């Protein structure tokens, strides 16, 4: 066999592996400085300063300032109130701050600005709320450890000089990917995972998962905790909460049903992990921060947005169907999830109302009422584990639809149990 034939055989035999490695790992971890300039001063946190060394990355990061609806009609980067399309939110979160202000998220550069403007923030709000809102969090944690979590939020605004930006995901000293959220590191350690030994591909999801995840505040210290000890599924996290970890039992008491409720927070990482992309080793950044080329230079886009805004770069590196077909496929999945999500949310809202009416009946069976409250607590948790996500279920459609179906079933059980308690039909 000639040398040329041997070379061709090697290329054919290993081509897929080489291609995937090139597409997904080529440039994201160690960005090259502009025109070979020296690296910035170690410890620099200002994205504008770092942007002078990485102009293409910074230019794309600036696109996160744009506000526009999603190409699929779901999500988007305009901070419109969700209750305008989902009025059931006002019932389901009655008695807690999300009934006052629950909007779609704008881009990362707005993180501090939107936190300050949120109607959920009051003079009593604590520093734990800053954990995923500033690039300064690793410095704050280094100086104060978890003590910052119980500080007044207003004080931390003085130390949080930059919104979510470079230093949340890159070590300012080495520019390598790193996780800055201590809650994520602690959760992974409890799961037996050493983040310091993570692969490049894993890190490209970990830097996103450190904030796009469910969490709660430890009652005494206000430390941020991720409820992953039993797993990432809604059922597993619910079982974890049932054990009242660190004394945590509930986020609030619903004023209608008197159920002890939980509020889910953007569990995107958990949902992605069990989906086809997560199980296939496709990282968050592969789709949401694709590799681009400009003036002959490859760089990673830092416009963290829907892959449907740049289908060619985000999707067609793996998928060979046309852009229109891919967009319609995503729309179809999201439409199915949206319809079932609305049914679940409205059924949960009705359950709260029925339990409240049943409890007002003088001779209502208290034991049955408690069963109904537990059912609506769990039904709403399952609904919220989908409703609180970004992506309208696309990260794991099978799991999401199953979760919503179970939510609807439990909400109907809650209604039936409440009616049984009151020996009537509301």
Enumerate the language-model features and the residues they cover.
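A cross-kingdom signal targeting lumenal/periplasmic-facing segments of multi-pass membrane
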Residues: 122-140, 145
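Long, charge-dense tracts
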Residues: 104-126, 158
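Hydrophobic membrane-insertion alpha-helices, especially the h-region
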Residues: 5-25
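Long amphipathic alpha-helical segments
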Residues: 417-426
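N-terminal secretory signal peptides that target proteins for export/translocation
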Residues: 1-2
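Primarily the internal scaffold of c-type cytochrome electron-transfer domains
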Residues: 23-106, 142-286, 290-418
